[in-house]
Amino acid sequence: MDGEDVQALVIDNGSGMCKAGFAGDDAPRAVFPSIVGRPRHTGVMVGMGQKDSYVGDEAQSKRGILTLKYPIEHGIVTNWDDMEKIWHHTFYNELRVAPEEHPVLLTEAPLNPKANREKMTQIMFETFNTPAMYVAIQAVLSLYASGRTTGIVMDSGDGVSHTVPIYEGYALPHAILRLDLAGRDLTDYMMKILTERGYSFTTTAEREIVRDIKEKLAYVALDFEAEMQTAASSSALEKSYELPDGQVITIGNERFRCPEALFQPSFLGMESAGIHETTYNSIMKCDVDIRKDLYGNVVLSGGTTMFPGIADRMNKELTALAPSTMKIKIIAPPERKYSVWIGGSILASLSTFQQMWISKEEYDESGPSIVHRKCF
């Protein structure tokens, strides 16, 4: 199967958003929520063309009458039937392509269960009949997108965060750390602290409103304690947000208390280290000779790193942990929300990558376990 004549598809299946498009493009064509919604009520009007399930933006727009489910939790697919619906929607409705005509590059979180990528491989070849496919590690793709071959990627999405040190293009698996604390946990935490303010958000549809509040208004404080005092003594930090029904709510210290949980997971009742400490621990698991190169190339990627102020705070926290003479550089590319996808687009269009694809023939010969031999 010759990869030259046909464009590969790149699908970055995040826990929160699915990013899809064509290899060689500089941005994904389709970006939609990884949601499958099912009606909460039975339809009474005949001929309305009501469906038993909705995917992506359509589910989002009809969320008032639907129960929304995310098939990917913490980067791991928990519902394969819904996942198939999302892929089907990606190929046929969003990209409008026939999957049997294009090689497909999929992404996954590091340290995922092996069964997860085997099942992905199986569905691609058996349900969608793709001619070839590949599963790439998300953080590695982000590094590609930043134009580096060495660095430590702190990738934080909706479902999972991880730090992946990469040296001269090789990921160092023993030093990869995973943190099951990401955007969705911050949204839940925001729901909780808004409840303390007297605003109640409980349903799956209301959670989406809170996610929007978080994305539009939250930021990371450089000094949390000082910021708390500022918020207590003046209303300078207060912002208002208009709910879909016209009601206006005011939010103050919640704006920075919410993402602070990334640095202090104890806010969520978690015992784990914050993202700064996880990054540091990951660097310390690497050989002493390469640490300097990692400290100098800390690459942020994923939607949860989009909070204003996160890079400065990360710099401050890492500087406090690292040796005093160490030069620390945090790279936060403006397009980091999509850097995994962009890296996939770059990788799948490299001529040297074309022999890396798992072909249908290889799959038929070896079965799903081929994915562990061919993919990283």
From Swiss-Prot:
The keyword ATP-binding applies. One of its GO terms (cellular component) is cell cortex. The modification Phosphotyrosine is found at Y54. It comes from the Eukaryota. The keyword Nucleus does not apply. Disulfide bonds: none annotated. It is found in: Cytoplasm, Cytoskeleton. GO terms for molecular function: ATP binding; hydrolase activity; myosin binding; structural constituent of cytoskeleton. It catalyses: ATP + H2O = ADP + phosphate + H(+). One of its GO terms (biological process) is phagocytosis. Keywords: ATP-binding, Cytoplasm, Cytoskeleton, Hydrolase, Nucleotide-binding, Phosphoprotein. InterPro entries: Actin, Actin/actin-like_CS, Actin_CS, ATPase_NBD. Pfam families: Actin. Its EC number is 3.6.4.-. Actins are highly conserved proteins that are involved in various types of cell motility and are ubiquitously expressed in all eukaryotic cells. Multiple isoforms are involved in various cellular functions such as cytoskeleton structure, cell mobility, chromosome movement and muscle contraction. Belongs to the actin family. This is Major actin. It comes from Dictyostelium discoideum. The gene is act1.
